[in-house]
């Protein structure tokens, strides 16, 4: 038993890496040996491909069409779209697009189900039979043949050994020798019979194995067709899917373009406005002036010319992004941004900065720098004119348009604080920049110096816009923004001519007929210089005059008290207020204030707003006399001579109502606080 196992191990060791075995190699030719070596790799390849391809299936394996479609993710997506479509307006653009997409996903799901069923039938099942049935059967026959050959070789070894033993026993004499010889001969006969039977089995198994090898070699091409058919099925699946998608996309785009009533929505997408070259943008839209330049200029001409710090102050990022999107999708809705000129200016700067090539062109960068380096103004202006003439036509038109606008903006520098120098500092780096070159720090320093020269170039263009770009310009070139820039704001000369001269009205020489009391110092002086009109309702006594003066100083309007029916007593009374020391007529200095009596009636004097320099009169006598003054109704028809007589007695001078007013340098004496409160 141990010898048999050891012999088997030797056979396995002699097999080698090529897969050849001594048991089968002696029965096979060179061609069949190569076929035999391809059996194991073919079996492993078919098994692995079948396993991974089975994992690629999205539907239920082995199910019919309807069950398979329900399990597909595309069908689940189509169902979700159908449920979402019910909540949308079927006439809206989004509703129509979602409905069409839902139908396409359903169609793609059915195409995928058909593809998977075909794949299972024509590829997966043959690979499964090849890896699980056909090749294992051939390998099983090979293994059986190896075992039979091994057993046959072992039996032949035993038979040879038995024959040797039988020959050695034949030379022994005696009864025991003949018995041993007979036993050995019988054993040899039995081994010969077994060897004959085993040889027949080996021949039979060898024939079957050779037949399998021939069959495999003839069907090897058909096995390769499995993989070719896999690619054909996939190509057919993708072709059907692409056809369905192309048909649906064409129909969907037609419907969407018909539903869109704005021609610029599809003609000017965001990618065709910002970040593209100027020539491409103008050719695609059929324009002479870039859309962002014209729209932003018209918006600023409409509202933002006097905005302080225009182009210098940054706008909000969200507002700027929304403005740029509106610019690209619906330029007719830009009027809502008129109230934010900084956002409009930011959109213009963003467009100039995002151009692939600067508006003043990189090819002429050195020429611009040479023109800026000239010191003599005339030579510099001539050099700038020469460089402008060599610009491409589309660049020249847009630069002329922009410089004309910036010149108008600089005319408002007293209000917006944007001088040509400030405008050039802000916009210069967006109009011209040096070509991109990789270099050291010295080149970076040179670039920073060139940016200063760029500012000088742009400043000179703004200051000499009328010389370098002669003639007026119509800023509303395309005519699609009639509401942004009125026709009177189109050219620079029209803007300046529209400002009417400001006329200052001359002051009135005659007073208003209204007899209402004045509350301002200027009006008081005017009324003091004019004759005092007779009030149709009331005539004030001296006490009321002083009270009204106090009211004017407090900025408070109070009702006047009733006028007494009896004339005031003579100033010589012991209870009257002591008069101020009188001077002879004509001896009063005009610069010296004079105290006036309290009960001056009929005069046109008004109390000043500032207190007089003289001290107040003791209030006691006046308070006792004021209690004796009875209140009476207003008498509008009292003769003016009464007031005139009282004034004459108190004052000692001929002061009448219609007479000339006293000198303004003689203010009346202020009224005591106690008398004012009692009178009120």
Swiss-Prot record:
Site (Arginine finger): 312
Gene Ontology terms, MF aspect: GTPase activator activity; semaphorin receptor binding; SH3 domain binding
Sequence ranges assigned to domain BAR in this UniProt record: 81-262
Location within or outside the cell: Cell projection; Cell junction, Tight junction; Cell junction, Adherens junction; Cell projection, Phagocytic cup
Tissues showing expression: Expressed in all tissues examined. Highest levels found in spleen and brain, lowest in heart and liver.
GO CC annotation, single: lamellipodium
Biased composition (Polar residues): 160-169, 536-546
PTM-bearing positions, type Phosphoserine: 241, 262, 535, 582, 632
UniProt superkingdom: Eukaryota
GO biological-process terms attached to the record: actin filament organization; cell junction assembly; cell migration; establishment of epithelial cell apical/basal polarity; negative regulation of small GTPase mediated signal transduction; phagocytosis, engulfment; positive regulation of GTPase activity; regulation of actin filament depolymerization
SUPFAM superfamilies named in the record: BAR/IMD domain-like, GTPase activation domain, GAP
Quaternary structure note: Interacts with RAC1. Interacts with the exocyst via EXOC4 and EXOC8; required for the localization of both SH3BP1 and the exocyst to the leading edge of migrating cells. Interacts with CD2AP and CGNL1; probably part of a complex at cell junctions. Interacts with CAPZA1; recruits CAPZA1 to forming cell junctions. May interact with AFDN. Interacts with PLXND1; they dissociate upon SEMA3E binding to PLXND1 allowing SH3BP1 to transduce downstream signal through RAC1 inactivation. Interacts with ABL1, GRB2 and SRC (via SH3 domain).
Name of this protein: SH3 domain-binding protein 1
Organism field: Mus musculus (Mouse)
């Amino acid at each position: 038993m141990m010898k048999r196992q050891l012999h088997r191990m030797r056979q396995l060791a002699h097999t080698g890496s090529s897969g050849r075995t001594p048991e089968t190699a002696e029965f096979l030719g060179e061609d069949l040996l190569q076929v035999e070596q391809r059996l194991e790799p073919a079996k492993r390849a078919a098994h692995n491909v079948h396993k991974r391809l089975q994992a690629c299936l999205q539907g239920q394996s082995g199910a019919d069409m309807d069950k398979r479609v329900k399990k597909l993710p595309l069908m689940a997506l189509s169902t979700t779209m159908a449920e979402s479509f019910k909540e949308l307006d079927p006439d809206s653009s989004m509703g129509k697009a979602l409905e069409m997409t839902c139908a396409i996903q359903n169609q793609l799901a059915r195409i995928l189900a058909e593809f998977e069923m075909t794949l299972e039938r024509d590829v997966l099942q043959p690979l499964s039979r090849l890896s699980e049935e056909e090749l294992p059967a051939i390998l099983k026959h090979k293994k059986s043949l190896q075992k039979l050959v091994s057993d046959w070789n072992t039996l032949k070894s035993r038979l040879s050994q038995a024959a040797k033993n039988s020959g050695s026993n034949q030379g022994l004499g005696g009864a025991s020798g003949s018995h041993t010889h007979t036993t050995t001969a019988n054993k040899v006969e039995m081994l010969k019979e077994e060897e004959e039977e085993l040889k027949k089995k080996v021949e039979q198994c060898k024939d079957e194995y050779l037949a399998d090898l021939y069959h495999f070699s003839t069907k090897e091409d058909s096995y390769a067709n499995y993989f070719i058919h896999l690619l054909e099925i996939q190509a057919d699946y993708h072709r059907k899917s692409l056809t369905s998608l192309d048909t649906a996309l064409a129909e969907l785009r037609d419907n969407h373009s018909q539903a869109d009533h704005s021609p610029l929505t599809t003609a000017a997408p965001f990618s065709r406005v910002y970040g593209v070259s100027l020539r491409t943008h103008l050719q695609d839209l059929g324009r002479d002036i870039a859309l962002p330049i014209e729209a932003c200029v018209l918006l600023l001409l409409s509202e933002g010319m006097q905005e302080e710090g225009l182009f210098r102050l940054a706008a909000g990022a969200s507002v700027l992004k929304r403005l740029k999107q509106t610019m690209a999708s619906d330029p007719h809705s830009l009027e809502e941004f008129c109230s934010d000129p900084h956002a409009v200016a930011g959109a213009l700067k963003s467009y100039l900065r995002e151009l692939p090539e600067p508006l003043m062109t990189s090819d002429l960068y050195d020429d611009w720098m040479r023109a800026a380096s000239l010191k003599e103004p005339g030579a510099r202006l001539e050099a700038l004119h020469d460089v402008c003439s060599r610009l491409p036509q589309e660049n020249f038109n847009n630069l002329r348009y922009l410089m004309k606008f910036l010149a108008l903006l600089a005319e408002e520098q007293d209000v917006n604080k944007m001088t040509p120098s400030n405008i050039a500092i802000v916009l210069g780096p967006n109009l011209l920049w040096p070509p991109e070159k990789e270099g050291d720090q010295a080149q970076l320093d040179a670039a920073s110096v060139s940016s200063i020269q760029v500012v000088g170039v742009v400043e000179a263009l703004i200051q000499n816009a009328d010389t370098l770009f002669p003639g007026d310009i119509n800023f509303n070139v395309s005519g699609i923004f009639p509401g942004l820039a009125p026709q009177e704001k189109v050219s620079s000369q029209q803007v300046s001519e529209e400002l009417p001269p400001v006329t200052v009205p001359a002051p009135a020489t005659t007073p208003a007929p209204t007899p209402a009391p004045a509350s301002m110092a200027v009006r008081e002086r005017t009324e003091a210089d004019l004759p005092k009109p007779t009030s149709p309702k009331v005539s004030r006594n001296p006490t009321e005059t002083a009270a009204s003066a106090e009211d004017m100083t407090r900025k408070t309007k109070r009702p006047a008290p009733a006028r007494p029916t009896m004339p005031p007593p003579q100033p010589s009374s012991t209870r009257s207020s002591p008069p101020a020391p009188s001077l002879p007529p004509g001896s009063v200095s005009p610069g010296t204030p004079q105290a006036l009596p309290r009960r001056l009636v009929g005069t046109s004097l008004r109390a000043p707003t500032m207190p007089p320099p003289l001290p107040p009169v003791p209030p006691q006598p006046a308070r006792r006399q004021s209690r004796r003054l009875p209140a009476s109704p207003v008498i509008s028809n009292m003769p003016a001579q009464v007031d005139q007589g009282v004034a004459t007695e108190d004052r000692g001078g001929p002061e009448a109502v219609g007479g000339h007013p006293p000198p303004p340098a003689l203010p009346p004496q202020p009224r005591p606080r106690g008398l004012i409160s009692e009178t009120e």
